[in-house]
Regions:
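N-terminal pre-catalytic "stem/leader" segment of glycosyltransferase-like enzymes
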Residues: 2-119, 415-425
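C-terminal amphipathic helix plus adjacent low-complexity
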Residues: 2-29, 363-425
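A nucleotide-sugar donor-handling region in carbohydrate enzymes
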Residues: 26-46, 154-157, 166-251, 279, ...
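Conserved catalytic-core segment of nucleotide-activated headgroup transferases in glycan assembly
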Residues: 69-83, 200-289, 365, 406, ...
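Donor nucleotide-activated moiety binding/catalytic core segment of transferases
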Residues: 109-123, 279-326
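A donor-sugar binding/catalytic signature common to diverse glycosyltransferases
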Residues: 125-148, 152, 302-349
Length: 425
């Protein structure tokens, strides 16, 4: 990271303040407008939501994927404060899976049921990682918290890609940089975007990383291993297809020939890479490697772990436009940015922080040769970006502790004390 490449967010903040809750930046491209039927349904839901009385201290949670780390952290903190939660899930099968992952007591309700809608309408507090029921505008007496699932330091979202304003009460972020972008992405006033940290990071910082490493790597637990978390390029949802880059890759942004070269080098140098594809990624790698393994969400669930409890179990991170690298700064471990299609991605999807190549706190590589060279430096313990990571951590994090969830609930539940005898499960 170049010290001279400072982020100037003043203009963004000024526009956010002056526009109030109607912040607008011209998006580079649009994603389409909801149908008339959906708009009418949303208007009716909004009206009913303003009429139905809310139950004090009633929390409804919803995360994607099923056991999203931020939602799990909130459920645990609610338990510490003597509160329970209702968790919306897809179906009975998901309810069974979730019951094994949620350490704190919760009631699981199918999201498509009348009961789920009634819980939503009667809840004083709604906490989500994405949208829910079309994001109707909540009344002042209902608090809707959108944790989101990453800091806006990489790919564009929300209004930048033509989406409408996100109707929430609170959307916590990590820093002033995140606050500036979140205001414009979601169309929120800065007062709605408090700098509190991210609940998902509490789970990353408090997990038993040695035990998680043993559970995930087994006999290879003593072998140098990096975790590769690429963002998605293609999403297929029913009949809809969303493409963020012109070239389709097999789950990671390199073709099979390059992956085989990287795999051969890793095997020859007694190192490993574990790839966890993005949950939305439609493409997969159909090849058996010797030193590259693939980790699915179900593999984590099998050992009762999640993405964030597993992060520190690895020796370093490989990523591209995934905002996970911002969270990973709290661990102060090496990060490799493998982004061969950045020009294509920049033109198609767009990046928030530019020039991205010069601002990221780690080696930025495109070709397989550059990738292998960065792996070689990693194995030789040539950490040339330690100072850059420290600078990035100061820039992108106000808090570096595991107290983000507590700060969030202090914000929305003023005066609600914690019970000393109740520790997090």
């Amino acid at each position: 990271m170049d010290d001279r490449a400072e982020l100037d967010t003043t203009g963004i903040v000024d526009r956010a303040v002056s526009a109030g809750s109607h912040t607008i930046l011209a998006p580079p491209h649009g994603r389409g407008r909801p149908s008339l039927r959906n708009r009418v349904a949303l208007a009716l839901l909004t009206l009913v939501n303003w009429i139905v009385p809310k139950k004090r201290d009633k929390f409804v949670l919803h995360g994607i994927p099923l056991c999203e780390d931020g939602i799990l952290a909130v459920a645990d903190e609610l338990f510490v404060r003597g509160l329970s939660s209702i968790v919306l899930v897809a179906d009975h099968q998901d309810a069974t899976r979730a019951s094994a992952m949620f350490c704190s007591p919760a009631v699981f309700v199918g999201k498509r049921s009348i009961a789920a809608l009634w819980h939503y309408l009667t809840a004083r507090y709604i906490v989500v990682s994405h949208g829910l029921f079309g994001d109707p505008r909540p009344p002042p007496w209902q608090c809707v918290v959108n944790l989101w699932h990453g800091e806006p330091t990489a790919k564009t979202i929300g209004r930048y890609i033509g989406r409408s304003r996100i109707n929430v009460t609170t959307a916590p972020v990590l820093s002033h940089v995140g606050q500036a972008y979140r205001c414009t992405e979601f169309g929120l006033h800065p007062k709605q975007v408090p700098i509190l940290g991210a609940p998902r990071n509490d789970r990353m910082l408090t997990a038993d990383h040695a035990e998680v490493r043993k559970a995930l790597l087994g006999a290879d637990a003593d072998v140098p291993t990096l975790l590769w978390l690429p963002t998605y390029r293609s999403v297929v949802n029913g009949t809809a297809t969303w493409i963020d880059a012109a070239v389709r890759f097999p789950g990671v942004p390199y073709d099979l020939a390059d992956l085989r070269r990287i795999d051969d080098w890793l095997y020859s140098n007694s190192a490993r890479i574990v790839v966890k594809r993005h949950p939305l990624e439609a493409d997969t790698v159909n090849y058996q490697f010797r030193a590259i393994a693939f980790l699915e969400h179900t593999d984590l669930e099998r050992v009762n772990e999640t993405t964030y409890t597993s992060l520190a179990a690895f020796d370093g991170l490989i990523t591209d436009a995934s905002s996970v690298w911002t969270d990973y700064l709290l661990l102060d471990k090496p990060i490799i940015f493998a982004f061969p299609d950045i020009d294509d991605y920049r033109a198609s999807r767009g990046l928030n922080v530019e020039p991205y190549e010069h601002l990221v706190p780690g080696p930025f590589v495109k070709s397989a040769d550059e990738f292998i060279q960065s792996l070689d430096r990693f194995l030789r313990n040539r950490d040339e970006f330690a100072e850059a990571r420290q600078l990035a951590r100061r820039r992108f994090h106000r808090f570096c502790d595991a107290g983000s969830t507590a700060r969030l609930l202090d914000e929305i539940l003023p005066g609600r004390t914690r019970f000393p005898e109740r520790t997090r499960p």
